[in-house]
C-alpha cells in the first residue's frame, strides 16, 4: 500500500509512464523490455559503483541512488519500474531483478511460493542495504594516503 499518494494517483502516474514509453518505442512489448533493461542496468551500475569502485565519491553516489530507490518504494507500494513492466509486457512472467536472481531456486528443486518469494526478496533487500551502508562506512572512514 503506498504511503504518500493514493492508489488512483499512483495508478495514473504509472499509466502515464507506460503511455510515454509505448509512444517512445511504438510497441508495448519493446517498451516493456526497454524498462526491464533500464531497471536491471541501473541495479548493476549501482552495485558496481558501491562494491567495485574505490572512489569515495562514486561509492557515495551509488549509495545515494540506492537509498533514493528504496525511498520511492513506499510511494508506489513497491517498485514503480516493476509496475510499468507489468503493464507493458501484459503477461504473468515477471522479469524484474529479483525474479532473475531468485529464479534458479526452482531449477535446483526449491520452487518458491509467492509468500516465500516475497520474504526472500525482503530479506535480500535488507541484506543488500546493510551491505551498501557498511561499504559506505568503510570507504568514508578510510584514511587516504594523501591525508596522512
Which residues does each predicted region cover?
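Cytosolic-side membrane-entry/anchor segment at the start of a transmembrane helix
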Residues: 2-44
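Core segments of transmembrane alpha-helices
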Residues: 36-47, 121-129
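Hydrophobic alpha-helical transmembrane segments
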Residues: 46-54
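Hydrophobic alpha-helical membrane-embedded segments
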Residues: 56-86
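Extracytosolic (periplasmic/ER-lumenal) interhelical loops and adjacent juxtamembrane/interface segments
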Residues: 89-114
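Individual transmembrane alpha-helix segments
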Residues: 107-129
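Membrane-water interface at the C-terminal end of transmembrane alpha helices
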Residues: 128-143
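Non-transmembrane, juxtamembrane loop and terminal tail segments
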Residues: 147-148
Amino acid at each position: 500500500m503506498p504511503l504518500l499518494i493514493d492508489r488512483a494517483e499512483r495508478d495514473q502516474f504509472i499509466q502515464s509512464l507506460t503511455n510515454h514509453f509505448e509512444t517512445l518505442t511504438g510497441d508495448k512489448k519493446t517498451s516493456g523490455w526497454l524498462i526491464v533493461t533500464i531497471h536491471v542496468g541501473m541495479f548493476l551500475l549501482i552495485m558496481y559503483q558501491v562494491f567495485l569502485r574505490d572512489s569515495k565519491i562514486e561509492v557515495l553516489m551509488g549509495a545515494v541512488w540506492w537509498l533514493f530507490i528504496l525511498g520511492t518504494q513506499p510511494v508506489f507500494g513497491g517498485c514503480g519500474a516493476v509496475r510499468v513492466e507489468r503493464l507493458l509486457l501484459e503477461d504473468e512472467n515477471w522479469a524484474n531483478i529479483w525474479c532473475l536472481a531468485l529464479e534458479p531456486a526452482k531449477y535446483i528443486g526449491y520452487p518458491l511460493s509467492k509468500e516465500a518469494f516475497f520474504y526472500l526478496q525482503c530479506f535480500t533487500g535488507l541484506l543488500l542495504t546493510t551491505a551498501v551502508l557498511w561499504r559506505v562506512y568503510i570507504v568514508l572512514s578510510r584514511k587516504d594516503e594523501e591525508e596522512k
